[in-house]
């Protein structure tokens, strides 16, 4: 297929595909999905070999969020029966992190519900970061605390944080349809603050919220322009008790096409399969490792994930290897500066845009698999052992 050959060549050169090419990936048929995976897999292996980076989530504060993000089980007005608890103490968070690290994780992601941290919250998280780093040599720590105020990213960096996550989630044009309590521009500004403070920026998306192919391409191109080092790709977990509970729009093949498109647009960036992989990729999860070079180990913030042991077996059986703590995740040209930093330098590649945008046929809608959505009842915030 000429399209795929062209995209592989561009990916190996870190050249931005046209919008038409990105849309064409999403429009490929299920009959061609293995060809798409094989092509994007060449780009993935060129930049990341067969390594898979493991990340581990620690939910520092769960539920009771004042924001109205319609996809979120922790949102204002959510009826989802999730765990709700206030801030974990530093030693509790460090203990939770240790379980993930013992399971093979290289990075710990510290997440807290809410619009954004107060300065007191930043102090609290700083103590947690120091506790984790003191007890686990070489661990990477990423914070995800919401919208940042001036100076807070610098303070997190000084406390030892390596990265900051704040997802764009969807396109600017449809952002107001999923959230009204803050704006798309607010999210962009927070990613920029993380960059400016010298933190490795992590920013991604959520697929399956009813968006169009054009929306998906828009948000991935916006991410490319922001130049994060890591792009988590979430697949909506339709929690009962949230406005998007009935949005079952994804098939395993659709998820693979989305991951392939992200890999072609962001060829040398850590692409992470995040929330919802078990729900939507299901038995095709191993194929997704040919597209992404990073996953979350174990459970998510409010839902259960695949057993940690099963994650490790899946990686090995698919012919991949867990990235070690002594291995550098990013390609050499990105690693020294933590990203390209400018349109002219190397990093993620050229920032040109353009290209016609078409409209792909609506994807086939799978039967709602509510049986696969399990609320987390173990690990952080409970007395039960974590999944790692």
From Swiss-Prot:
Keyword Iron: yes
Classification via Pfam families: BATS, Radical_SAM
An example Gene Ontology molecular-function term: 2 iron, 2 sulfur cluster binding
Transmembrane segment boundaries: none
Gene3D superfamilies in the cross-refs: Aldolase class I (3.20.20.70)
Cofactor entry: [4Fe-4S] cluster; [2Fe-2S] cluster
Homology family: Belongs to the radical SAM superfamily. Biotin synthase family.
NCBIfam families in the record: bioB
Name of the protein: Biotin synthase
Source organism of this protein record: Streptomyces avermitilis (strain ATCC 31267 / DSM 46492 / JCM 5070 / NBRC 14893 / NCIMB 12804 / NRRL 8165 / MA-4680)
Phylogenetic placement of the source organism: Bacteria, Bacillati, Actinomycetota, Actinomycetes, Kitasatosporales
């Amino acid at each position: 297929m000429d399209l795929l050959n062209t995209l592989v060549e561009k990916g190996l050169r870190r050249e931005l595909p046209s919008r038409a090419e990105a849309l064409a990936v999403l429009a490929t048929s299920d009959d061609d999905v293995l060809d798409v995976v094989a092509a994007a897999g060449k780009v993935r292996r060129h930049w990341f070999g067969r390594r898979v980076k493991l990340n581990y989530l620690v939910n520092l504060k769960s539920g009771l969020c004042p924001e109205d993000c319609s996809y979120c089980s922790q949102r204002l007005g959510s009826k989802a029966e999730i765990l709700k608890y206030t801030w974990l103490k530093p030693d509790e968070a460090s203990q939770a992190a240790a379980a993930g690290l013992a399971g093979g994780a290289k990075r710990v992601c510290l997440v807290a519900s809410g619009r954004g941290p107060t300065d007191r919250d930043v102090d609290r998280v700083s103590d947690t970061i120091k506790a984790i780093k003191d007890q686990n040599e070489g661990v990477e720590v990423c914070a995800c605390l919401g919208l940042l105020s001036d100076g807070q990213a610098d303070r997190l960096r000084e406390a030892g944080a390596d990265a900051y996550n704040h997802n764009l989630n969807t396109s600017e044009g449809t952002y107001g349809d999923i959230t009204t309590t803050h704006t798309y521009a607010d999210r962009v500004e927070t990613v920029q603050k993380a960059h400016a403070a010298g933190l490795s920026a992590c920013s991604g998306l959520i697929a399956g919220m009813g968006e169009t192919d054009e929306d998906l391409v828009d948000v991935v191109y916006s991410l490319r322009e922001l130049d994060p080092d890591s792009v988590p790709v979430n697949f909506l977990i339709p929690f009962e008790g949230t406005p998007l509970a009935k949005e079952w729009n994804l098939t395993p093949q659709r998820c693979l096409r989305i991951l392939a498109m992200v890999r072609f647009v962001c060829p040398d960036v850590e692409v992470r399969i995040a929330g919802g992989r078990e729900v939507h990729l299901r038995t095709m999860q191993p194929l997704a490792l040919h597209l992404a070079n990073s996953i979350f180990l174990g459970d998510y913030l409010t839902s259960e994930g695949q057993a940690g042991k099963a994650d490790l077996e899946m990686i090995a059986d698919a012919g991949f290897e867990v990235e070690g703590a002594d291995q550098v995740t990013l390609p050499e040209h990105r690693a020294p500066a933590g990203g390209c930093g400018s349109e002219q330098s190397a990093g993620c590649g050229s920032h040109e845009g353009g290209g016609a945008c078409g409209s792909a046929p609506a994807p086939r809608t799978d039967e709602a698999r509510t049986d696969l959505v399990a609320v987390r009842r173990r690990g952080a915030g409970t007395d039960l052992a974590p999944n790692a």
